[in-house]
Amino acid sequence: LRTIESLYYLGVKLQNTKHPISDGLIVEQWEPYDINNNVLAPKESLNAILTYMDDNNLEVFIAATRIIIAPGYEFKFVDGLITNFHQPQSTLLLLVSAFVGDDWEHIYKYAMEHDFRFLSYGDSTLLWRDLE
């Protein structure tokens, strides 16, 4: 999810770039929360990446991301998420909360009341964003 969502911010960085970037492309942790980074439609952002690759004869696109997805994040691409149940105090709970809003508490309460297993080998859930 973080990788897919990071594509938007990489496209924003590349929208007016014609020459190869030598020091590497990275999306920093809090970069998505800067209002100046939400300037393109998602499709335009992906097209900026493709144009950059074409202009520089690149067949492979390499970048890094450090973004944290927390409440207040505006999702650009993802409407559904399959994930396991995360421990309290995990930053991954921030991602779930950002994705489903306050419903995360009801989801986790239900999981705990019904003895769902948590962590990597535990139960998983399919979450949908409320698009209204």
Residue ranges, per PLM feature:
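Surface-exposed, charge/polar-rich loops and edge strands
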Residues: L1-E132
